[in-house]
Curated annotation (Swiss-Prot):
Pfam families linked to this entry: AMMECR1
Residue ranges of domain AMMECR1 in the record: 8-200
The organism's place on the tree of life at top rank: Archaea
Protein name: Protein MK0488
Database matches in PROSITE patterns: AMMECR1
Stored PANTHER family: AMME SYNDROME CANDIDATE GENE 1 PROTEIN, AMMECR1 HOMOLOG
Amino acid sequence: MGEKLTLEEGEFLVRLARKAIVHYLESGKKIEEKPPTQRLAEKRGVFVTLKKYPDDELRGCIGFPEPIKPLVEATVEAAISAATGDPRFPPMRDPSEMEEIKIEVSVLTPPKKLEVDNPKEYVEKIEIGRHGIIVRRGARSGLLLPQVPVEEGWDEIEFLSHACLKAGLPPDWWCSPDCEIYVFEAQVFEEEEPEGPVRERDLAEEQ
């Protein structure tokens, strides 16, 4: 990952995500936006999370774990997919629903594989409040963003177990030598309320 984003750049991405969803729901077309800074033109992984306000109930979360697209383009696509393509939820159809939705954008570092001699070492290498994780076995994978264990109050074992479940694997699969674990970090920018001020979350402080 390149340099960290400024709060202004994070705010731009959050506003862009909202604009992209509303524009798509109104017109069926994907918005095109030029990156205002060089950092926002870099290829980076990104996830867009939609939460119902004020209870923070999840409404959708989609993204790109790998840095395969320029950040602005990836944010637009992830936002639209989070609103209309998350299989866990009915697709959003009415733009007015966005008036009750809070947006969070997580900008990721490239995933890094953890090398261990014993799977139990994973527990020591993962830091709650810092790391997101990806569990992989063949074509199956499960990703959890770093804010998830903080919000759920999980420890490292629970974090690993839930990532396995998300991959469609048994919860203790992380103990298997066939399992691959990747970690990444994220800058997380969120609206305090729908269309409200944007802040950068400090996950370590939230624990």
